[in-house]
Amino acid sequence: MPISSLENLPNESFYDIFEYFDACEIYHSFSSLNHRFYQLIKSSPPLLKLRLSYPESNEIFINNYQKVLLFNKKQLLSLHLWSTENTNQIASSIIFDSSFNSLQSLIFYTIDIDLLTSILPKLTCLPRLFSLAIDTWSHPKNLGDIYRLIFNLPKSKFVRFTATEADNDDVTISLPIATNEQMGSIEYLIMSHPCAFDELFAIISYTPNLRRLKFLYLSNRNVSIGSIKSMVLPNLTNLSISIYKEISFDELKIFIEKLNSKLKIFSLTTIVEDVTYLDANRWEELIRTKLPQLEEFYFRYSAYFSENYDTPLYFGQCNQFISPFWLQRRWILEIEVEFENVIYLIRPYQKRWYEMINGSDQLSKSIRLSLDETCPERWTKTIFIEDYIRHALNLTQIYHLEINAQIFSGKLMKILRLLPEVNTLKISSLSISQSESLFYEDIEFLDFLSNEKQITKICFKNMKDMNQIQ
C-alpha cells in the first residue's frame, strides 16, 4: 500500500531522518506537530547531537535544549557549545552525571576558566566521554590544575585545549611528572597555548598511549632541554610543532632525540632567526639518524622582513634540497612571498598546473616561487621585491614562478631577469596598456617575452583581452 502521508511513515524512518538534524532542531520542528511526534521524540530515538554554533541558531537552541536534557539525556551523543555568547550560561546550567551514559563528545568554546574548573571533576562519571575540546578566553596564569583534571577523565582519547588569551611567557604549567597510577588514556592531544620544554614533557608523561601530538606555541622559558629526562612514547607517530620563540635547530634536535618515538608524520612551523633550519644537510642527518621511519615531512620557515631589521641570510651550500635524499622521498621545497615574509616550505610533491612530474631528474627542477606580494615598496621605503627573491636565491635556484597579485609588465620583466632558470610562468593579473598606446616598458617586456627561450609554458589566469599578449 503506497504511503500518501508523511505521518504514515514508520517510526524507524523518522529516526533515520533525525540523524541529520541537531536535537534542538528536531524539537523545534516536530514536537508541536501532534501527540505522536511529541511522544516519538520523548521516547527512545537514536543518539542525538546537541550543537550551538552560529547566531541564527541561538533562539532555537535556548528554547529547546532543556527539553533535550530532560527527556533525552541518555540518548545524547555530543554536546558542542560553539557560541561566544551563551556557552557559560548553558554549561553552568547542566548537571553532568552518569545518566549521560551515551555522551561521547564535549566542546566548550570561550568557557570561563573558573567554570571549567568546576565542571571537569563532574565529567569523570561519564562512562563514554572519549573527546573533549576546550577553548577558554580567560587569562590563566597556571594551566597545571586544568591538566590535572583532564588527566583524571578515565575514557578520554582525544583532547584539544586552547587558551586563546594565554599568549605570553607569564603562563606556566605547574605539573609534576606522572607516576604509573596517574597515567591516562589520551591518544590524541592538541595544545594551543604557551608551553616550555619541561612543561611539555611533564604533560606527556601522563599520556603513554599518545599517538598524535600537536602543540602550537613552544616557548623557550630559559629551560635547558639537555637537562630534561627522556620520554618513551612508543605509539607516537604523528607530531606537529609550531615555534615562535628563539629555539635553535640544535635544541629541536635534542627534543626529537628525547621523545624516543617512531614518527611517521612530522610537521614543523617556525618563525625564528636561526637559518640552520634551512640547512638541508642538517635535516637529512636528523631524519636519517633519529626519524628513520618518517613517511611525511611538512616544514614551514618564515623569514621576516622589516625596515631597520637585518633579515638573517642563509650562507650555506646552495641547491641542497634536490639531493637524492629529498627526491627519493618526493619532499619538495617551495617558496612563497607574503607581506613581510619569505616562507620556505617542504611538503610531499603534488601535481601542478603544467604537468605531472614522475622522474627524479624532473623533480630536481620542481622548485617553485609564488608571489602574493610584488610591490613591498608601497609599504616600506627600503625593501623591494628583489630583496625577497635574492634571499630565496641564496638557498636554491627557482624553476617555476607563480604571481598571485596584479603586476605590471615592467616589474615582471625585472623579476624574470633575476630568475634565468624559470621555465613555467603563471600570472594572476598582468597589466599591459592597450595596443594603441603601449608604453615603452610594455613594448620592451613583450619583446623580452617573445625572445625568452627558457620559459616553455605560460598561464594567464585573468587576462581579459588575449590580443594583449600576441
Task: Give residue ranges: language-model regions.
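Eukaryote-biased activation of long, low-complexity terminal tails and linkers
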Residues: M1-Q470
